[in-house]
Amino acid sequence: MHIGQRIREIMTQKQHSVVSVARALDCERTNVYNIFDRKDINTSLLQKLCVILDHDFFKELSKDTFKK
């Protein structure tokens, strides 16, 4: 799974703007766009995004890791 692309998909589905996520993360919009390009992400940032977007990315990553 490309985590950055998945974050973008969930943001779109839940109608969160880049601006609103940047504000919630206390960062610039460019940082959010940079997240979209990432194939991996640190856990503290992912945890914040889980809360902001009300989505469990950890569960998705776990399923992706252990699928047969």
Please tell me what each predicted stretch does.
Residues 12, 23, 51:
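Alpha-helical residues within the helix-turn-helix
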Residues 15, 40-43:
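Residue at a beta-strand N-cap/secondary-structure junction
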Residues 26-41:
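Recognition helix of helix-turn-helix/homeodomain-like DNA-binding domains
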Residues 18, 29-30, 57:
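The DNA-contacting recognition helix of HTH DNA-binding domains
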Residues 9, 14-15, 34, 61-68:
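Short, charged recognition helix plus adjacent turn
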Residues 1-16, 20:
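A short, Lys/Arg-rich alpha-helix, primarily the initiator
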Residues 44-60:
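DNA major-groove recognition helix of helix-turn-helix/homeodomain DNA-binding modules
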